[in-house]
Amino acid sequence: MSNYVPRLKKVYTEQIMPELKKEFNYSSVMQIPRLKKVVVSMGVGVALTNRKLLDAAVTDLETITGQKAVKTKARKSIANFKLREGNEIGAMVTLRGARMYEFLDRFINVALPRVKDFRGVNPNGFDGRGNYSVGITEQIIFPEIDFDKIERISGLNVNVVTSAETDQEARSLLAKFGMPFRK
């Protein structure tokens, strides 16, 4: 393995950790909130009728994240949606370590500014336990996606799981990473 360190991880260890320790008066370095994982998922409800769209979604996710995507299956049958338990209806990728920092860096600094009429991400996307979720309406904001080759424009979800105890700590952590929260 090389001794390569992602830019955001370096920023975290050199700048963000001391700032957070000072801001929240932590007694131990282990109390400082950190990123655990980033989950990128795509729900493809239309996959029930057109299997090709699910494969396209998997390919898009793999292109965006640089890691193999897993197809997700329906947990329950819902008659109104013509959905059976076990049907493949989406895809997801869980990123950890260096890939997580690289993805978050690209997401914050390259993809989000390409969103039409972008005024910042919703500051209410926290779940009460220090995790943040944001929905993206078009996958074409990522430069890796070739506009001419996509089957269908679809959205995706990005969940950032942190070790923070409260939403305030998590918001401070993500803001220091450069997440552009709406005022």
Curated annotation (Swiss-Prot):
Which Gene3D superfamilies does the record match to this protein? 3.30.1440.10
Q: Which GO terms describe its molecular function?
A: rRNA binding; structural constituent of ribosome; tRNA binding
RNA-binding among the record's keywords?
yes
Gene Ontology cellular-component terms listed: ribonucleoprotein complex; ribosome
Q: Which PROSITE patterns did the record assign?
A: RIBOSOMAL_L5 (PS00358)
Question: Which UniProt keyword terms apply here?
Answer: Ribonucleoprotein, Ribosomal protein, RNA-binding, rRNA-binding, tRNA-binding
Point out the coiled-coil segments of this chain.
none
Under the heading InterPro entries, the entry gives: Ribosomal_uL5, Ribosomal_uL5_bac-type, Ribosomal_uL5_C, Ribosomal_uL5_CS, Ribosomal_uL5_dom_sf, Ribosomal_uL5_N
Share what the entry says about its subunit structure, partners included: Part of the 50S ribosomal subunit; part of the 5S rRNA/L5/L18/L25 subcomplex. Contacts the 5S rRNA and the P site tRNA. Forms a bridge to the 30S subunit in the 70S ribosome.
Q: What does this protein do?
A: This is one of the proteins that bind and probably mediate the attachment of the 5S RNA into the large ribosomal subunit, where it forms part of the central protuberance. In the 70S ribosome it contacts protein S13 of the 30S subunit (bridge B1b), connecting the 2 subunits; this bridge is implicated in subunit movement. Contacts the P site tRNA; the 5S rRNA and some of its associated proteins might help stabilize positioning of ribosome-bound tRNAs.
Q: What is the recorded name of this protein?
A: Large ribosomal subunit protein uL5
Species in which this protein is naturally found: Treponema denticola (strain ATCC 35405 / DSM 14222 / CIP 103919 / JCM 8153 / KCTC 15104)
